[in-house]
Amino acid sequence: GLGRATRNVVSDTLLEQFPPDEIEAILAHEAAHQAHRDLWRMMALEVGMGYLMAFLVSRVAPVMVTWSRRWTGVDSLEDVASVPIVGLATMLAGIILAPIGAANSRAIERQADRFALEVTRNGFAYASALRRIAAKSLADPFPPRLVRIVLATHPPILERIAMAEAYNSKNANG
């Protein structure tokens, strides 16, 4: 939520299927999003990307109309028949911009993971919670590189587990 409506909701499934130390780690991760105002950061990026998308479409769509004139019979963006061409230009711009939003989201999630580890000081619990989430999830633990770069909004679960385990090792030795 925004403003006074900001809340973390704890589901009965979480309470029933996760031990308290893992719930604490999960809530610390979610609290990080509030502490860092991640929703506002993501909204600002999306607005900026919306303007960038509109700019790209304004440049690409006229070129596409000219290029496709022979096949479509569309001479101008003022022709209602150009709507599918504008739609295609919008889709292409979205594909081009998708990795930017995904990379930003992954960076925010990594930051929230680090916050959870620093607040709870319990990488064991966080790694265990992530393993439990992975076991219940249908997400691919080894997504292809292209999927990770273009579409993934979270780092791969195994990378996150490794980070939590590294936190344990680092703090056990230092």
Describe the role of every protein-language-model region.
Residues 1-77, 91, 95-174:
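Polar-ligand-bearing catalytic/cofactor-coordination segments
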Residues 80-91:
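Short, contiguous hydrophobic alpha-helices characteristic of membrane insertion segments
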